[in-house]
Amino acid sequence: MADAPYKLILLRHGESEWNAKNLFTGWVDVNLNEKGEKEAVRGGELLKDAGLLPDVVHTSLQKRAIRTAQLALESADRHWIPVHRSWRLNERHYGALQGKDKAQTLAEFGEEQFMLWRRSYDTPPPPLADGSEFSQSDDPRYASIPPELRPKTECLKDVVNRMLPYWYDGIVPDLLTGRTVLVAAHGNSLRALVKHLDGISDEDIAGLNIPTGIPLSYELDTDFKPLNPGGTYLDPDAAAAAIEAVKNQGKKK
């Protein structure tokens, strides 16, 4: 291994149509809204201004992350780099909550149950029925996933377990070549990765929020441990304000 630190950039997709409507999204494939597109472009500008230019990008199979990567890379003039996509970087599957309004869910089930489903490490929501309009059971992009691995609901622990094989088999090999790696993904798949990188406990991960569209830069040592624990946001003031807004999701009317 090289002695120089490895460079990893995490980027949560820009605001989506359902983020703006305060709906649980999960595996439902919604697009970015206009604000989200601008966030993605700004994310690329931040990368370029910082001189932190990715050599390869990894993203999910969901269009909001794919589109964010495209817009950010175009803005940073890195549209030509290799792109790898995996369902293992998808957002957490929210089960029967997918498509539901967060504020209405909070009012219906109460804050304790709402927060248990939304933020506990190992308590998933009820599973999504196959016949639901928000089911991905017939989606061709997931046809190659063995049925036993295709989720109908997930907690964050499930996301960690399905994401980590891709970290070791897909992302780490690119880091080992000395490439600067961009991972454009989702709030919970990135929380799962940050939990692993920073060694965050099952209890403390509940308090971690990742804002949309603001690159989070990590420098990793040769054991892939952060030299800058918690990472460094390229726009820390905007990140702090956005993190506070994420905390308040569910309270919006």
From Swiss-Prot:
It comes from the Bacteria. Residues 126-148 are annotated as: Disordered. Pathway: Carbohydrate degradation; glycolysis; pyruvate from D-glyceraldehyde 3-phosphate: step 3/5. Substrate binds at residues 12-19, 25-26, 64, 91-94, 102, 118-119, 187-188. It catalyses: (2R)-2-phosphoglycerate = (2R)-3-phosphoglycerate. GO terms for biological process: gluconeogenesis; glycolytic process. Its EC number is 5.4.2.11. The active site is at residues 13, 91. Coiled coil: none annotated. InterPro entries: His_Pase_superF_clade-1, His_PPase_superfam, PG/BPGM_mutase_AS, Phosphogly_mut1. Pfam families: His_Phos_1. The record marks 186 as: Transition state stabilizer. GO terms for molecular function: phosphoglycerate mutase activity. Keywords: Gluconeogenesis, Glycolysis, Isomerase. It is an enzyme of class 5 (isomerase). Belongs to the phosphoglycerate mutase family. BPG-dependent PGAM subfamily. NCBIfam families: pgm_1, PRK14115.1, PRK14120.1. Catalyzes the interconversion of 2-phosphoglycerate and 3-phosphoglycerate. This is 2,3-bisphosphoglycerate-dependent phosphoglycerate mutase. It comes from Streptomyces avermitilis (strain ATCC 31267 / DSM 46492 / JCM 5070 / NBRC 14893 / NCIMB 12804 / NRRL 8165 / MA-4680).
